[in-house]
Each structure stands twice: as structure tokens, then as C-alpha cells.
Amino acid sequence: MSEKPVIIITGCSTGIGAYCAGALHRDGWRVFATVRRTEDMAALEGQGIEVLIMDYTRAETIAALVDEVAARTGGRIDALFNNGAYGQAGAVEDISVAVLRQQFETNVFGWHDLTCRVIPFMRRQGRGRIVHCSSILGLVPYRYRGAYNASKFALEGLGITLRMELEGSGIHVSLIEPGPIASNFTATALKHIKANIDIENSAHAQEYRRQLARLEGSGPVNKHKLGPEAVYKDLHHALTARRPKPHYVITTPAKQGVLLKRLLPASLFYRLLRKFD
């Protein structure tokens, strides 16, 4: 059995996943990092990280991942960091059922499948940590993010319910809720909105053009955006603290959003959000 604590981290091609995989490896963890494409393996393997192929939309790859990790570690899985996701932008009325379903396949159903597959290993050990990289948009909705909002709100519900159900088992569940973080997330969102939204024939065409200008870099820059190390700080706490928190809200805008949601009347709060989307 592996002597080092074992963690599975998903979505490690770039951004938060890649950074956290490297940081945990340097901090003494045995890291199993997942990517969807073989060409993304080399950079991680060069750091001494064990890399496996996994796609949340393909159940057979999820099952194979868990089987392979268990085989290599003698059945030890100490932690899971669900991180791989993407954001489908677009007005709710412009999101087809097929596009919405794909958003949930990646951001919710795949996460649920993987989580449920590692829990039996953690139960046998009498301990474990499950951390979901959610989003501030799982707590505070933004316009033109309905599909992504919905997937993260669903994840919040599943995650906190699971935390409550696992109380006393030695398995702790935490949700990390970042605001703007430097990553390839925006570039991926841009690709999906162009592929799945009929922009020119939408009642929201003018707003789409404004948002595309921002996503493509000709709009205002978000001065509150942090690097992935901000996520790692809270991930490390969630993995190692005796009493990990249920929620870790990251970045100033995210913390402000949570506070204002608590303090303001709902109608005023939602009107205020229109100024920041």
C-alpha cells in the first residue's frame, strides 16, 4: 500500500488542476492527475506526477481511473479533488436541452459518478477528504450563465447533502467557491458559446457581442482576478485541517457577493448583480 497520502485530481491539463497537482506533489502527496487528451500528459509526468486519462462524460473512463489508482496504491485513496469543468454561457432561452444536458454531464453527473466510486475505499479506511471546486456562481447567479449556474447550484446541493450524510464516517466534504481565477476557463467558455448559441438570431445578440468583446480581450480587465495559488491555499486546508470548512469562498468579488446576498432584499440584490455580469 502507498505510504504517501493518495489524491485524485481531475481537470489537470491547465489552470487550477495543473497548479494544485504540482503543489500537492511537492508537498508530499502521491498525486493521480487526470486529463482528457494524451498530449496533456507530458508536462505533468515531467514533474513526477502519475497521469491518467479520464473524461467525465464517459463512464467507462471513470471506472477505469478508480480501478487503476486502487491497483497501484493497494486500495488506498485518501482524497478526491473534483475540478474538471467548463462554463456554457448563453441566455437561458437560447440553451437547448442537448446543450444543457452536456453541461450537466460534465459538471455534475460525472463528478457524482467519480465521487460515489471513491467513497467505498474511504469508508474501509475510516477516513477521506472530498473537495469539489464549485464556483461563486453556485451561490450567486449571473445573467447569461444559466446553464453553468444551474450545474454549480446542483453541485452545491449534492455536496453539502453528502457532507451531512457522511458525518461521523471520518470522510469530510468541502466546497471551494472561487470567483475570478486566472486559467483557460474563459477561452473554453468562448469556444462553447460560439459553438452552441445562435448569436445573430437571438433576442440577446447585442449583449452577446458585448460579452464576446470582453471574453476576447477587448473589454475591461477584471482587476480582482487571482492566480490558482489562491485555490491551493484553501484546498490544502480542506485536505489537512482537523475540521475542514464546508465552504471556502475565494476572491474579493465572491466574498462580497455572498455577504450582499445575506444582507440585501432579494429583489434589490438581483438588480445589483446586473451591474457586474
What role is predicted for each listed range?
Residues 115-116, 160:
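A short, exposed helix-loop element centered on a Lys and neighboring polar residues
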Residues 168-219:
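C-terminal beta-strand-loop-alpha-helix "lid" module of Rossmann-like NAD(P)-dependent dehydrogenases
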Residues 91-92, 99-101:
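Substrate-binding pocket helix/loop in short-chain dehydrogenase/reductase
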Residues 46-60:
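Rossmann-fold cofactor-recognition segment
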